From Swiss-Prot:
HAMAP family: RNase_M5 (MF_01469). PROSITE patterns: TOPRIM. The keyword Transferase does not apply. This is Ribonuclease M5 1. The gene is rnmV1. Its EC number is 3.1.26.8. Disulfide bonds: none annotated.
Length: 191
């Protein structure tokens, strides 16, 4: 695929490192900003805020603890950024190593960028904690597995029970979206 055929991304994509940048640029025509780890400097946060005001920002970090930490730091400093998520499967290395954007296929990257979420920090919860409990997502023998599958299906990343409520609220996932996802993830034939 030549440069002219690649999907063009207007926003700046925030990634963790230079290998992530290389992989993103194989998949799409986009500018990136690298955090160079989870200890994000005030200068980098200022750059992200400036880019958000001028072009918009997409946070695209690894589906691991460090990636979630970076995502949280940026979200708190610059509310309203967009988020792209890879599944752990899509970010797995072919041999040894840790999960990372740098291991994802161009197709997986384009798919993640096609399903962006924008935070609504002050949004009203559309789904209650009780809804999550009744669905078996916060307790019970299958809760962890159901949350993993739900995170993959909705492309919002893996969360624990408490984080799930916050993330569904943050991204304004509707009861209908949750119901459709639950029907899919609880069908063992899909996994």
């Amino acid at each position: 695929m030549n440069e002219n055929d690649k999907m063009k991304i207007k926003e700046v994509i925030v990634v963790e490192g230079k290998d992530d940048t290389k992989r993103i640029q194989m998949a799409v025509n986009a500018d990136t900003l690298e955090t160079r780890g989870s200890a994000i400097s005030d200068e980098t946060l200022d750059q992200i805020e400036d880019l958000y005001d001028k072009r918009g920002v997409i946070v695209f970090t690894d589906p691991d603890f460090s990636g979630e930490k970076i995502r949280k730091i940026i979200t708190e400093a610059v509310p309203g950024v967009k988020h792209a998520f890879l599944t752990k499967h899509d970010a797995a290395p072919s041999h040894k190593g840790s999960l990372g954007v740098e291991h994802a296929s161009p197709e997986a990257i384009r798919e993640a960028l096609a399903h962006l979420y924008t935070e609504v920090p002050d949004g009203e919860p559309l789904i209650s904690r009780e809804d999550l409990a009744v669905a078996g997502l916060t307790s019970g023998p299958q809760a962890k597995e159901y949350r993993r599958r739900l995170g993959e299906y909705l492309r919002i990343g893996y969360t624990n029970g408490k984080q799930l409520y916050k993330r569904l609220k943050l991204f304004q996932i509707t009861p209908d979206e949750l119901k459709k996802a639950l029907e899919y993830i609880k069908n063992e034939d899909n996994y």
